């Protein structure tokens, strides 16, 4: 081969090499782009899952466990003392919410934003449409000291019930389980 032919051949190979290198660089860039998209999709998926979990927690559709208190209320057997009413339970729930309770249940009926607590008669109270009987066991997850203080302070709901003659016990715990709401959540007035 002559020198001119060698130079031409070398130039052809150099051109082919540069073209192959260019394609390689483009493919590397695409691979990197796909990796970033995959990571972004994973991050998006994780974010969506976290939001779904938080929404389910707020809707009461998941069990919640953490520090908190368990209150047991046994009504007095004396006929001279007024029975425990739905209003008493509502006052306890409201006091717990004000003290920062993150989840509350009464006799394992999860308290939601649309929970109804109503008197049926002197023996029965309905929570979420379910009839509950005494003793009433109220569980609340949150700062256990704050929750207890909200109930036992002077003029607190538990303090008032004790003064009336009802038996009220409050136990602080590092492990309180508030079970999920098993019913269907339906809205009457919200449009889809």
Task: List each language-model region with its residue ranges.
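Core subunits and conserved enzymes of cellular information-processing
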Residues: 1-192
């Amino acid at each position: 081969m002559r020198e001119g032919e060698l130079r031409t051949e070398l130039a052809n190979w150099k051109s082919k090499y540069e073209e192959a290198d260019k394609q390689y660089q483009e493919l590397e860039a695409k691979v990197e782009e796909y990796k970033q998209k995959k990571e972004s999709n994973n991050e998006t998926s994780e974010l969506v899952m976290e939001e779904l979990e938080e929404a389910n927690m707020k809707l009461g559709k998941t069990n919640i466990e953490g520090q908190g208190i368990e209150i047991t209320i046994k009504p007095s057997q004396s006929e001279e003392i007024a029975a425990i009413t739905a209003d008493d339970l509502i006052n306890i729930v409201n006091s717990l919410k004000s003290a920062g309770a993150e989840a509350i249940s009464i006799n394992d009926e999860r308290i939601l934003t649309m929970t109804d607590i109503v008197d049926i008669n002197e023996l029965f109270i309905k929570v979420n449409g379910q009839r509950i009987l005494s003793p009433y066991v109220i569980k609340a997850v949150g700062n256990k000291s704050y929750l207890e203080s909200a109930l036992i302070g002077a003029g607190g709901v538990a303090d008032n019930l004790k003064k009336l003659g009802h038996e009220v016990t409050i136990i602080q715990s590092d492990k309180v389980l508030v079970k999920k709401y098993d019913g269907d959540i339906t809205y009457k007035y919200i449009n889809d």
